[in-house]
């Protein structure tokens, strides 16, 4: 080896080794201080990618476990409300058993029915107000998906149902008969009295009525109309004033005579969907029904409505609306425009049949047993929505209370309702157990993944402490050797001194 001064190769080699050892010492100190074997991708690129995927799974599964616990809380909240609904149903059943014995008076039954109604109202309140984090859990049918995994479509569904008196089949539930039928004064709701209605049959037309007082050609009267039972109008056909309406007088024997000085001061308008003729004088609609023997009506509107029974069968009928807003079932002749009130008969709790009675729409559910409507038999307890209620009798009397509102087979109805609640509670119990199992599995999976991640990225302190100690010793030795290497060029001076 040449003796040189400018380049100390031994010192350079020693410095390089010291730098390498310094890097190893720094890595060991970093791992020991962070606890991680992989502090950056340069430590282990593949290991860093694997560990990062584990981190995503672990965090996702941890949140999924929290989601599942929330799902358990939803099911518990819902079941708690159902438990209270069940308590109310059991009380209603107890009261119903009490009501079915024959020793109860009408007053007793009324008291029992009041508590039953209160219990059913409470069921409706619980159904409408039970919430979890702002979500109504018993107010409507639906489902709630609980995310129980770290990836897409890893869910458990909680089925929710609307549970109230209506869905339980207890809407209008009653343990007593409405067996008192009262009547009001003669009906004026149709804008016409029920006596002395003008009918086309049996009317004798006088000679004077055959000719318009202001015309010269022969004319005849097509019909006579009234809006209040006192003032009458006649429609003229033929002659100079064909199609016009004039005031007339009607004698007790049915003779119709043109009123003195009568003028055609009435206009004709169309009455909605019925194609019937309405006389309007001064903005007041008058009688439009020119059918012999039919009740007359001061109509606000006639429209087609649909009734649906519990089996989903539809029945179409016309709804006749009077000036008070009451709706009555009606028949409409599309050709003549004639509107007549549809009548029914019904049987009260004593078994007595009523006289023909007009059908009023919009009554309370389960209040009327309808024997016959256009040849079809219905029990209004089976009706859904617009139930039937008697309103106007053929004799002109309005029924304000209707018979036979007692629920058929009430205990069976309650047993069915309780069974429905039990079935829902069973499904909630099953989903609670499933979610609880999911939480256990998620926790186990999270533990195993965390251990796997630890083996990849965590520092082994025994190894790293050993590596650090080794690097420190080498560092100290390197520093000592470097001092010796730096003194080698001085040996060349001895050659110069000689």
UniProtKB/Swiss-Prot annotation:
Gene from which the chain derives: fliC
Keyword Nucleotide-binding: no
Function: Flagellin is the subunit protein which polymerizes to form the filaments of bacterial flagella.
PANTHER family: FLAGELLIN
GO molecular function, one term: structural molecule activity
Protein name (record): Flagellin
Keywords associated with the record: Bacterial flagellum, Secreted
One cellular component term from this protein's GO annotations in UniProt: extracellular region
Keyword Secreted recorded: yes
InterPro entries referenced in this protein's UniProt entry, alphabetically: Flagellin, Flagellin_C, Flagellin_C_sub2, Flagellin_D3, Flagellin_N, FLIC_barrel
Family named by the database record: Belongs to the bacterial flagellin family.
Species this protein is from: Escherichia coli (strain K12)
Localization per Swiss-Prot or TrEMBL: Secreted; Bacterial flagellum
Membrane spanning residue stretches: none
